[in-house]
C-alpha cells in the first residue's frame, strides 16, 4: 500500500504541497514517517547507511566474516558429541565397576533402588555385604566384651564372625581375643561360653 500523497491526486499538486496543506501533517510526518528535507541532518551521521549501498556490501562481507565464529561453534558442536559420549561412558563405567568390585552393599541399595542389581545382588556383592556385616558385628561386641567380663559369649560370637569374614579358622581367631579380655587367666575359650549358659 503506497502512500497516497506520493501520487499526484489533482493535476500539478505534489506530495510536498499536499503535506504542507494538510493540518494533520503539519508536524513533518508523512504516513507516520518523519519527512527529512535537505536542511535536516540525520541523527546518527556516522551510522547512516550510504545511499549507493557500497558500504553495505562491505558490511555484508564483515557479516560473512562474523559467521566464522558460529562455524567454530559448529566445531564446538562437533566436539560436543565426543563430550556426550564420555558422559555416557562415565555412567556405564560407574555402574560396571560397582557390580564387579561390589564396593559397598549399602551404597548399591541406595543407588539402585529400582535397579535389578539391587534386588538380586551378585555373589560378590553378597560376600561384600556379609563382610561388612561381620566387621560391624565383630567390632561392636568385642568392645562391649572388653568393657564387661559378663558378655564373653557375644565376644566369642564376634570373634567367630570376624574369623568367618576373614576366611580363617574360627578356633584360631576365637581363642586369642577371648583370653586377654577374660578377668581370670586359667579359663579357656569354651569354658566361658558354658559359664554364661549356666547364668
Curated annotation (Swiss-Prot):
Q: Where is the composition biased (Basic residues)?
A: 86-98
The answer to whether keyword Transport applies is no
> What's the protein here called?
MARCKS-related protein
What residues bear Phosphothreonine in this entry? 14, 85, 148, 170, 182, 191
Membrane-traversing stretches: none
Modified sites of kind Phosphoserine: 22, 36, 48, 71, 93, 101, 104, 119-120, 135, 151
Q: Which gene is the coding source of this polypeptide chain?
A: MARCKSL1
- Provide the Gene Ontology terms for cellular component: cytoplasm; cytoskeleton; plasma membrane
Q: Where is it located? A: Cytoplasm, Cytoskeleton; Cell membrane
Q: Give the start-end ranges of region Effector domain involved in lipid-binding and calmodulin-binding.
A: 87-110
Membrane topology annotation: Lipid-anchor
Q: Which UniProt keywords apply?
A: Actin-binding, Calmodulin-binding, Cell membrane, Cytoplasm, Cytoskeleton, Lipoprotein, Membrane, Myristate, Phosphoprotein
Please, which domain of life does this record's source organism belong to?
Answer: Eukaryota
Give the Low complexity compositional bias ranges: 16-26, 53-64, 156-167, 181-199
Amino acid at each position: 500500500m503506497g502512500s497516497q500523497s506520493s501520487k499526484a491526486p489533482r493535476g500539478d499538486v505534489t506530495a510536498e504541497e499536499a503535506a504542507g496543506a494538510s493540518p494533520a501533517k503539519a508536524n513533518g510526518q508523512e504516513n507516520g514517517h518523519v519527512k527529512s528535507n535537505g536542511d535536516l541532518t540525520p541523527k546518527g551521521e556516522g551510522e547512516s547507511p550510504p545511499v549507493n549501498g557500497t558500504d553495505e556490501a562491505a558490511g555484508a562481507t564483515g557479516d560473512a566474516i562474523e559467521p566464522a565464529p558460529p562455524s567454530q561453534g559448529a566445531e564446538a558442536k562437533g566436539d560436543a558429541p565426543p563430550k556426550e559420549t564420555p558422559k555416557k561412558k562415565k555412567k556405564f563405567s560407574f555402574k560396571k565397576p560397582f557390580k564387579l568390585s561390589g564396593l559397598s552393599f549399602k551404597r548399591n541399595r541406595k543407588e539402585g533402588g529400582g535397579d535389578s542389581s539391587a534386588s538380586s545382588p551378585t555373589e560378590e556383592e553378597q560376600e561384600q555385604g556379609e563382610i561388612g556385616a561381620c566387621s560391624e558385628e565383630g567390632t561392636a561386641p568385642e568392645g562391649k566384651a572388653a568393657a564387661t567380663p559378663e558378655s564373653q559369649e557375644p565376644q566369642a560370637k564376634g570373634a567367630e564372625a570376624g574369623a568367618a569374614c576373614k576366611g580363617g579358622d574360627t578356633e584360631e581367631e576365637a581363642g586369642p581375643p577371648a583370653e586377654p579380655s577374660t578377668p581370670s587367666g586359667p579359663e579357656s575359650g569354651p569354658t566361658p561360653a558354658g559359664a554364661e549358659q549356666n547364668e
